[in-house]
């Protein structure tokens, strides 16, 4: 209640409460950010990196099947799955040379970090600029069939706006050009 002879005016009280509410909201947002950083801070790549999948690898001639989400592509699934299927990289000639070209092309990509590199398997994480979303990308050399199988999948979200498909198509074109 404001007294008639009070030196505090109604306009001053409104300003005071606006500033109080703004200050409290700022504290709440700051506390939420600190909690999020504490919770997600153990992950090496940031808040939007997600967790590394546990089903990585090329087993029995195939990668793990993509989820229902349209943010992944794989060359080892049924061709009828138009959302997820992508053709493997076909090569002619020396398998080791084609594999070497692929490995070099992956390492040269912005945001790429090779996690596992073997004679016939490559696993890399691709971190997007800005928000730091991470995609898991795998390649497997099938020298007998003259192909390199691939799988590229987003860890988070539902749609990737074609990022995973474009990535492997760019790598395909870079290998063909060399």
Predicted regions and their residues:
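Ser/Thr-rich, low-complexity intrinsically disordered terminal regions
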Residues: 14-23, 33-178
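N-terminal Lys/Arg-rich, disordered targeting/topogenic segments
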Residues: 1-19
């Amino acid at each position: 209640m404001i007294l008639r002879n009070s030196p505090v005016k109604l306009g001053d009280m409104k300003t005071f409460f606006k500033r109080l509410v703004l200050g409290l909201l700022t504290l709440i947002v700051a506390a939420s950010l600190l909690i999020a950083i504490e919770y997600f801070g153990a992950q090496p790549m940031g808040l939007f990196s997600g967790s590394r999948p546990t089903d990585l690898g090329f087993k029995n001639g195939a990668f793990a099947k993509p989820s229902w989400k349209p943010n992944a592509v794989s060359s080892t699934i049924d061709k009828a799955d138009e959302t997820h299927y992508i053709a493997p990289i076909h090569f002619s000639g020396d398998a080791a040379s084609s594999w070497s070209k692929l490995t070099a092309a992956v390492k040269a990509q912005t945001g790429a970090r090779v996690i596992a590199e073997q004679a016939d398997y490559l696993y890399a994480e691709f971190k997007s600029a800005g928000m730091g979303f991470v995609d898991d990308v795998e390649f497997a050399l099938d020298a007998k069939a003259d192909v390199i199988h691939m799988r590229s999948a987003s860890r988070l979200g539902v749609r990737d706006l074609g990022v995973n498909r474009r990535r492997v198509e760019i790598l395909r074109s870079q290998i063909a050009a060399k």
